[in-house]
Amino acid sequence: MTTETGPDSEVKKAQEETPQQPEAAAAVTTPVTPAGHSHPETNSNEKHLTQQDTRPAEQSLDMEEKDYCEADGLSERTTPSKAQKSPQKIAKKFKSATCRVTLLDASEYECEVEKHGRGQVLFDLVCEHLNLLEKDYFGLTFCDADSQKNWLDPSKEIKKQIRSSPWNFAFTVKFYPPDPAQLTEDITRYYLCLQLRADIITGRLPCSFVTHALLGSYAVQAELGDHDTEEHVGNYVSELRFAPNQTRELEERIMELHKTYRGMTPGEAEIHFLENAKKLSMYGVDLHHAKDSEGIDIMLGVCANGLLIYRDRLRINRFAWPKILKISYKRSNFYIKIRPGEYEQFESTIGFKLPNHRSAKRLWKVCIEHHTFFRLVSPEPPPKGFLVMGSKFRYSGRTQAQTRQASALIDRPAPFFERSSSKRYTMSRSLDGAEFSRPASVSENHDAGPDGDKREDDAESGGRRSEAEEGEVRTPTKIKELKPEQETTPRHKQEFLDKPEDVLLKHQASINELKRTLKEPNSKLIHRDRDWERERRLPSSPASPSPKGTPEKASERAGLREGSEEKVKPPRPRAPESDTGDEDQDQERDAVFLKDNHLAIERKCSSITVSSTSSLEAEVDFTVIGDYHGGAFEDFSRSLPELDRDKSDSETEGLVFARDLKGPSSQEDESGGIEDSPDRGACSTPELPQFESVKAETMTVSSLAIRKKIEPEAMLQSRVSTADSTQVDGGAPAAKDFMTTPPCITTETISTTMENSLKSGKGAAAMIPGPQTVATEIRSLSPIIGKDVLTSTYGATAETLSTSTTTHVTKTVKGGFSETRIEKRIIITGDEDVDQDQALALAIKEAKLQHPDMLVTKAVVYRETDPSPEERDKKPQES
């Protein structure tokens, strides 16, 4: 488009189009203002010139000529085209703001960001400055007018989030990785260590004296390197901070431990630091002040597995993400809707009172982000549409599954970075593919502070391991080489958060006591692919790597779908997924078992660190009622030689209870335990491969398999009942006789949380409050007699055993907490005599498989036997 110039053309245009006069006059009299801001004089001038449009054309000509002298390109200003923009927008310059970010090492980073820039722009600048690629675990925080910490939303403009004039931010960890060893790069672990050290110093991560010393020694090793007698003299750690109340005794203990580390690089020291810190009860818990319905001050903690409730620094409840149907807030109230249990009809809503509306919204956002990051495979897109009920806020970053996949693709040399006060080993050594074993001092338990979500059952018992306790199971961990199944199923790897490894020791102690009770010296923690000599090692010996060569962490294997370690199977045709070598070894071991005539209890050490069903913390009161008709009470505690003399040549390897764990229907599997999976229902078909797949799932619970010969003269009618306390008392006469003997086989190997309440047989142990009930079901009973080949789960032979199961569930609510007692009565009958010890142990094992989170408190057995033909002949003769 061309523009006419000169006085004649301007006069002509001004006379023809008088509406252009106000615009030209306004352009002359109004100073240039920033874009988006209108000067008040402009509006007044426009209004004045519009009302009085009687000025001659020569005045506009003079004004426009004056504008030509003042600015270039005025011809565009006088063109009548509506497509032309004002000169203010043409001359617009983007304004920038100075951002000051406090990093994790207490240094500050300043940068210029566009004033209308989004939070993601600033976050990317900080991560680029830090040379950080695994940045999804981190975030930026700022303080509002109430000095409350808020997370900077990367999808919104910065100026709309922060109101204060100086833009000050802090770079912190937003999502604490459940397993820091899976981080790919040393620099990521280094910044995580800095965050944890800051949490410990400020008291947000409480721990004991021993833990302070252990973590402090690794921090010193990472910063100062190996101990040097010439350089490190006196109290050389006094300048470093390790605890909120640092004492001389703590510093001396740290120096003693530091002297023992030789040749440990800073990267290795940081890995040991993180391996211990992740077991702390408050690791990764974001606390928020609130009040409950009664107005009592509580703390709401948000973590990877769900929502935690604390009162007086003690965790009183836990709601896992799969149990939460909906989270919402209204004004200053925060609500969570809980999924109904198996025996409940409606959902329940729990409300909390927060200090103000902003606090409720802040907590709601944190819950949304944590749930999306740790539980979902990909972030949920925000709702679209003009009218949308509720907030449109959604987490917009990458989830943990996506960031692990992206981290596996990182292929760059280990970045160089200088640690805070490091005097040696400043070059970060890449640990990709390297294996390390944690020293004995790492096996410390941390019970200080509120109970965290990874330690669900052991925290109530209050046990504390020493830092050099036996039984530490730690196998090598690979850092960079992530297996495909670990990447594609990230949610299953979350399950290991629920229980730490100290639960393993309690189960081992239970096995030891069971071993003494049954006079069996060879009760061991057994791996499927070990040879028999290694299976006879002590239970405290560490586990060997898995056959596949994958990193075998007891906490991680509970969530991954691997083969079961149960050995209750006779020699049979190899299943498609089994190995030829494994099958041969299994047959040889079966022969050894039957030859020794021993009651061997097989258990896998990693199966003890199983994640419990997310929010189910009730315990079961199992009553196996023992009443003997037609014979005197037979002592369960008699030694194995006595049992061996009563045995005949007929042999069996026990009953295999195929199980089907039913959970609430959800798009998400339980974050800490029973999961809805297509593999769970595999036992409904009678083919052998499906049955094998069900056995492969039993690794996620404590597996207890028992082999024994059958007693010819007795038929066992075993009833594992689950009932109310009144029903338990109904079987008290027989229960009292049973509990006078020490057959702790029934409960000692299954109890994980409470004290030994089995020796007293009067009543049940104290209940653990839990919000919901466990949903389980026994689908089929598969008898395996002798060496017959299992062809159908319903195959009937002359020796087939039949069962009938009756379940009673009693639930009481006290003070907002529900107590659940399940009494399950199992009656086993058959044409063949049944080994009472074997059937009892298998019944208890099946109960534990169905209710992994609940405690078996009582087991009593009724035994009914029909008189033998000789006895029938004797009775008429005597009469």
Swiss-Prot record:
The modification Phosphothreonine is found at residues 30, 79, 475, 550, 580, 685. GO terms for cellular component: cytoplasm; cytoskeleton; parallel fiber to Purkinje cell synapse; plasma membrane; postsynapse; postsynaptic density; presynapse; protein-containing complex. InterPro entries: Band_4.1_C, Band_41_domain, Ez/rad/moesin-like, FA, FERM/acyl-CoA-bd_prot_sf, FERM_2, FERM_central, FERM_CS. SMART domains: B41, FA, FERM_C. Keywords: Actin-binding, Cytoplasm, Cytoskeleton, Phosphoprotein. Residues 97-378 form the FERM domain. Residues 1-64, 428-501, 514-596, 633-687, 718-742 are annotated as: Disordered. The modification Phosphotyrosine is found at residue 343. Residues 38-50, 444-501, 514-538, 550-577, 635-650 have a biased composition (Basic and acidic residues). Residues 744-879 are annotated as: C-terminal (CTD). Residues 17-35 have a biased composition (Low complexity). Highest expression in brain, lower in heart and kidney. Within the brain, highest expression in cerebellum. It is found in: Cytoplasm, Cytoskeleton. The modification Phosphoserine is found at residues 75, 378, 430, 437, 461, 466, 510, 540-541, 544, 546, 564, 578, 639, 648, 650, 665-666, 671, 677, 684, 721, 782, 868. It comes from the Eukaryota. May function to confer stability and plasticity to neuronal membrane via multiple interactions, including the spectrin-actin-based cytoskeleton, integral membrane channels and membrane-associated guanylate kinases. This is Band 4.1-like protein 1. It comes from Rattus norvegicus (Rat).
